[in-house]
């Protein structure tokens, strides 16, 4: 066999192998069931996004598997993150939807972290967790002027230490702006915090505005709940008159705490991730499926109807942000640790 023929045979062989591998992946998900493990309670923002994905993402995964949503609450989604890292099989059939802010928790040595967040196989995110703080009308406080003048601390609910999007926002705002706040933590999700606020157990709470405006829509429209503060770099288009937290920061340190304690982690808060060791080809199939889903007209229409904003984050961008957290200046991390834990 001369060299030209040998090269041709080799090329054909590799083409057959490649086609077989591609066919294997396209067939892998056929007839299978994928689980999304949500770290928060049913009825909240994380849960709503996961259930939307379960309805629309299968059409963009070869083999069109069924996708089911399971809620595993506890410790601000820490229990679910630990489960995905340590228990879930790395077979491409289970991924988690939990707080990516645990990257900060790991750097700061929070107890209960049983994973290295850098080793998760990231899929990305459908939305960012850019937050607003809302208080009930019954609390008697409907403006920042009233809040700064309050004689007693305002009770704000959070899901738990390390749960970025609720806990970090409340604690950083309290420290940076010297606001009278009493943190009431331990709620299983935003749905539970809504109920607590409406019953008078707490005065208000915070989570991503793009989720809040959909899941707390009736109370916001009726005026029984009022947004008093935005914790984002720029105002949301539909909240042009609500002030920004950073505009009340009186020192460079206060601004830095808000920037790195709230703004920076917002893109990784609503993490979607697979267990370490998941085959790369299966992860790529799911990443592509996710990217196609967020562009799907029916998915977008459902999100619009529910008033849930979409702001996709790629797996690569998420990993870069996580890696960046591990490179933050030690002095800043020490200050944040003293505030958050």
List PLM regions with ranges.
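Bacterial N-terminal signal peptides
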Residues: 7-20
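A ligand-binding cleft/hinge motif common to bilobed small-molecule-binding domains
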Residues: 100-112, 167, 171-176, 204-249
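An extracytoplasmic/periplasmic, membrane-proximal ligand-sensing/linker region
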Residues: 30-32, 222-224, 228, 241, ...
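Ligand-binding clamshell of periplasmic/extracellular solute-binding protein-like
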Residues: 53, 75-77, 92-105, 125-127, ...
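Short loop->beta-strand "edge-of-pocket" segments that line small-molecule binding or catalytic clefts
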Residues: 32-42, 146-163, 203, 226, ...
């Amino acid at each position: 066999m001369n060299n030209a023929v040998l090269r041709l045979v080799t090329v054909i062989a590799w083409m057959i192998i490649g086609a077989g591998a591609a066919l294997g992946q396209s067939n892998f998900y056929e007839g299978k069931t994928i689980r999304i493990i949500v770290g928060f309670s049913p009825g909240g923002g994380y849960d709503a996004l996961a259930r939307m994905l379960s309805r629309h993402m299968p059409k963009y995964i070869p083999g069109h598997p069924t996708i089911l949503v399971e809620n595993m609450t506890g410790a601000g989604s820490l229990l679910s993150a630990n489960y995905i890292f340590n228990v879930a099989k790395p077979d491409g059939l289970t991924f988690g939807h939990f707080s990516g802010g645990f990257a900060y928790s790991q750097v700061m040595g929070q107890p209960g972290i049983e994973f290295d967040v850098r080793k998760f196989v990231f899929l990305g995110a459908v939305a960012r967790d850019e937050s607003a703080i809302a208080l009930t009308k019954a609390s008697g406080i409907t403006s920042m002027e009233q809040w700064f003048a309050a004689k007693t601390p305002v009770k704000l609910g959070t899901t738990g230490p390390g749960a970025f999007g609720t806990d970090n926002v409340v604690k950083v705002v309290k420290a940076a702006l010297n606001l009278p706040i009493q943190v009431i933590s331990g709620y299983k999700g935003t749905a539970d915090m809504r109920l607590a606020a409406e019953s008078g157990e707490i005065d208000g709470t915070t989570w991503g505005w793009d989720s809040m405006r959909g899941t707390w829509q009736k109370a916001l429209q009726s005026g029984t709940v009022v947004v008093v503060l935005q914790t984002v770099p720029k105002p949301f288009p539909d909240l042009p008159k609500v002030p920004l937290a950073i505009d009340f920061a009186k020192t460079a340190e206060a601004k830095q705490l808000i920037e790195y304690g709230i703004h920076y982690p917002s893109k990784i808060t609503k993490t979607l991730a697979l267990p370490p060791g998941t085959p790369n080809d299966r992860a790529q199939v799911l990443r592509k499926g996710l990217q196609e889903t967020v562009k799907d007209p029916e998915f977008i229409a459902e999100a619009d109807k529910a008033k849930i904003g979409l702001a996709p984050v790629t797996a690569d961008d998420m990993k870069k942000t996580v890696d960046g957290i591990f490179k933050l200046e030690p002095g800043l991390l020490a200050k944040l640790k003293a505030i958050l834990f």
